[in-house]
Amino acid sequence: MAGSAAPRRLIKPIGTITRGTTGINRLRRGDRWLAHDATVAERLLNADDPLVVDLGYGASPVTTLEMAARLRTVRADLRVVGLEIDPERVVPGQDGVTFARGGFELAGLRPILVRAFNVLRQYPESAVPEAWSTILSGLAPGGLLLDGTCDELGRRCAWILLDRTGPRTLTLAWDPFTVEEPSDLAERLPKALIHRNIPGEPIHTLLTAADRAWSHAAPLAPYGPRARWRHAADLLRQQGFPLHPQRRRLRDNQLTIPWSAVAPLPHQGG
């Protein structure tokens, strides 16, 4: 099923205007992951209409333009639309990218991929399920959503990949040279997880184990932080953590794990 040709101006945007903080190359780690992930590439390549939406691009469209350039290495005829709920941030199109007003309703578009970075972080945790549901219901068949968070310089990043059935994976990615240990990413977890980093929760168990593996891999430090992390990741796999295999050399330290391994535990009724 092809995506809508253009945003529908008569649809009322769903969401709240957020701070809009952005910066050049801030989302590069997420872009690199999208451009090399097998599932994302398969959906983009097989889409009748390869439409990608960057939801909530902020005060500047620079990261939308960067994403478009990186994803066009996967499919050159990719269509990209940047959506902003703040009408004052909507800018004229450039470099083959269109910009329009829109929120979680996606302005009536039917994209195969939506990137929402540093958007839901500014909402309460209780708002996440409905926001996910609204976005996912607007995707084209087989569509994907990337819900991510990062720091101001893009050195510490985390994102969840979802389809219409719900979350599929969690990825943590960080600058090998400025992050001391994996748990430093805790403050940049997506909203669905950031308040669950407490003892007994799966995400806390993962981060604690990752720090321990990182410490045990200290003898490899002379070979650099990337080599040290590769060994630490192998230790995590040996302990039963189902980390996705690393199939190429990465400039980032990174782990991707099935959502089932980190999903929040159900709240216990009082």
Residue ranges, per PLM feature:
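A conserved mid-domain beta-alpha-beta active-site/ligand-binding segment of alpha/beta enzyme cores
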Residues: A158-H231
